[in-house]
Amino acid sequence: YTSPEFQPCSETFSEKYAFVGPSIRSANEEIEKKRDKLIYISMGTVNNDMMPFYKACISALRDTDYQVIMSVGNLVSIEDFGELPENISVYSHVDQIAVLKKADVFVSHCGMNSVSESLYFEVPLVMLPQTSEQKGVAERVSQLGAGIKVDKLDGVSVMTAINKILSI
């Protein structure tokens, strides 16, 4: 489920192959956008035990005018975040489609489904790939000009990339 624009060397595939694009389901709920800019942070559903990274993002984004929605999975406890700033919400899971329909930037691990959904809704990415597949996906997104790859898992690097995207 990809497009010829996203598939590297798509011109080398024969007519036996059909590029049908991503399969995007409908949103199951509506997300309220409370501020001018909505930042969505999710590092996927498998390798997301990243409490230091999440806390660094909270520290970097706490005093901004951005609304931040973080989906952190079940490997970290929401209670361990303590009191959160008014502009930041943390959940174990969210309806990603509903959030992406309103998001201005998606901070992502670059899983193929997440990237496909982000591109479908025209949400630029701040990319923090963790696996070789995700690194390949991030490279293609960078080539297409649809996101910025960040090499360091820290809040300052993420915030710098977010600000760069929003200033374009």
Language-model features: locations:
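Nucleotide-activated sugar donor-binding and catalytic core shared by glycosyltransferases
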Residues: T2, Q7, C57, I78-I168
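Donor-nucleotide binding loops and adjacent catalytic segments primarily
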Residues: F6-V105
